[in-house]
Amino acid sequence: SSEPLIVSIKDTGSVYLEVESLLGQELSLDQLNQNVSKLLDADPSLQVVIRGDGRVEYEKVMVIMAQLQSMGAKDIGLITKEPLQ
């Protein structure tokens, strides 16, 4: 499908996948790996978008991005939401 897979990172560092079966479910890095690997197997050209809260630590985003790359995600985007003043 042409819809990107969205990985949300909250400012607390918790990670969520925006897919119907996992909505609102906090994932460990292992769970993230398993789920994303399955989706990439089904669709190797899947675009993955990391959506980080404005206050999320940059290192956390980099860790997730590196994980996605190691799983074979080729097309990774990044959206950051600015914290509200």
How would you describe each model-predicted region?
Residues 1-85:
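Long, low-hydrophobicity, acidic/polar, solvent-exposed interaction domains
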